[in-house]
């Protein structure tokens, strides 16, 4: 699941993913966060 959060590194996506999908799992792809559900 891509969320509308800009990133430069995967670490930035973990708290954003936790807030968005309830799971702190994801990575930074093409400057945007991708979360795993």
From Swiss-Prot:
Keywords: Disulfide bond, Ion channel impairing toxin, Neurotoxin, Potassium channel impairing toxin, Secreted, Toxin. The keyword Disulfide bond applies. GO terms for cellular component: extracellular region. It is found in: Secreted. The keyword Ribonucleoprotein does not apply. GO terms for molecular function: ion channel inhibitor activity; potassium channel regulator activity; toxin activity. The record marks 27 as: Basic residue of the functional dyad. Its main location: secreted. Disulfide bonds join 7-28, 13-33, 17-35. Residues 26-33 are annotated as: Interaction with Ca(2+)-activated K(+) channels. The record marks 36 as: Aromatic residue of the functional dyad. Expressed by the venom gland. InterPro entries: Scorpion_toxin-like_sf, Scorpion_toxinS_K_inh. It holds the Pfam family Toxin_2. Blocks reversibly Shaker B potassium-channels. Belongs to the short scorpion toxin superfamily. Potassium channel inhibitor family. Alpha-KTx 04 subfamily. Has the structural arrangement of an alpha-helix connected to antiparallel beta-sheets by disulfide bonds (CS-alpha/beta). This is Potassium channel toxin alpha-KTx 4.3.
